Swiss-Prot record:
Membrane topology: Peripheral membrane protein
Organism: Citrobacter koseri (strain ATCC BAA-895 / CDC 4225-83 / SGSC4696)
Era-type G domain segment(s): 7-175
GO cellular component: cytosol; plasma membrane
Functional note: An essential GTPase that binds both GDP and GTP, with rapid nucleotide exchange. Plays a role in 16S rRNA processing and 30S ribosomal subunit biogenesis and possibly also in cell cycle regulation and energy metabolism.
Pfam families for the chain: KH_2, MMR_HSR1
Protein name, entry field: GTPase Era
Keyword Cell membrane: yes
Region G5, residue ranges: 154-156
Gene name of this polypeptide: era
Subunit composition and interactions: Monomer.
Gene3D superfamilies listed in its UniProt record: 3.30.300.20, P-loop containing nucleotide triphosphate hydrolases
Chain intervals for the UniProt region annotation (G1): 15-22
Length: 301
């Protein structure tokens, strides 16, 4: 290979909600960019993660999970974001979960069959499959569904075979100049990443009670004289009862969320962070396309 040659391309990571797409992206990048939680629908924006290694630059688009339910405006916009990611990439990584196959997986597969980009099938969470004897027949079933570029059993959680996927990606990057400087890991702003970190902590500490009805707006993000950042985050919920839930008994819950979010921000921004959080009720935001636009849910569509 000539020293002057460089390779660069876009790769979409797609799949139904909660199959481990964000965890896989974070593992491919070697650090945390996309938020992860056990709750479906934690990814709401298309996050671009960038991995540069020598002559190779892979630009990953982490899509919201494609899913069948489209009644709420936020679900329609998330599906639109995921579908548009599939259309303009060099390669697709389709993530499925162990030996599970659902109508949502089928829907994603149908969209991929219509596309031109080659597809790597990442069968995630294989380490969690109880009946190992079921795995091979299931892989054979998957192989019969479409002409995949490759089928790779992986564990995004432990990192098993993630390097194999990275190697396949490198091999299929077209010759092109790099889009981003070598040290870039995402094209998202620090302000955006701060809101994602807070949202992850909300998802993590509030259990199943708040599936979509919480979002975060960063009202203030400024450098301070101590070489760090002062950040004010506004947590928006849909009902008064949810506000009480976020605040917790004598403010205990929001305090925990703030402490954990600040730790992650300091690690990501490599600087001290002073974080203040407020909670406000804004009813119906997840059903209101105008509200969603103002909160940045359609900034890249």
């Amino acid at each position: 290979m000539s020293e002057d040659k460089s390779y660069c391309g876009f790769i979409a990571i797609v799949g139904r909600p909660n199959v481990g797409k964000s965890t896989l992206l974070n593992k491919l990048l070697g650090q945390k960019i996309s938020i992860t939680s056990r709750k479906a629908q934690t990814t709401r924006h298309r996050i671009v993660g960038i991995h540069t290694e020598g002559a190779y630059q892979a630009i990953y688009v982490d899509t919201p999970g494609l899913h069948m339910e489209e009644k709420r405006a936020i679900n329609r916009l998330m599906n639109k974001a995921a579908s548009s990611s599939i259309g303009d990439v060099e390669l697709v990584i389709f993530v499925v979960e162990g030996t599970r196959w659902t109508p949502d997986d089928e829907m994603v597969l149908n969209k991929l069959r219509d596309g031109k980009a080659p597809v790597i099938l990442a069968v995630n969470k294989v380490d969690n499959v109880q009946e190992k004897a079921d795995l091979l027949p299931h892989l054979q079933f998957l192989a019969s569904q479409m002409n995949f570029l490759d089928i790779v059993p992986v564990s995004a959680e432990t990192g098993m075979n993630v390097d194999t996927i990275a190697g396949i990606v490198r091999k299929h990057l077209p010759e092109a100049t790099h889009h981003f400087p070598e040290d870039y890991i995402t094209d998202r702003s620090q302000r955006f990443m701060a809101s994602e970190i807070i949202r992850e902590k909300l998802m993590r500490f509030l259990g199943a009670e708040l599936p979509y009805s919480v979002t975060v707006e960063i009202e203030r993000f400024v450098s301070n004289e101590r070489g760090g950042y002062d950040i004010n985050g506004l947590i928006l919920v849909e009902r008064e009862g949810q506000k009480k839930m976020v605040i917790g008994n004598k403010g205990a819950k929001i305090k925990t969320i703030g402490i954990e979010a600040r730790k992650d921000m300091q690690e990501m921004f490599e600087a001290p962070v002073h974080l203040e959080l407020w909670v406000k009720v804004k009813s119906g935001w997840a059903d209101d396309e105008r509200a969603l636009r103002s909160l940045g849910y359609v900034d890249d569509l």
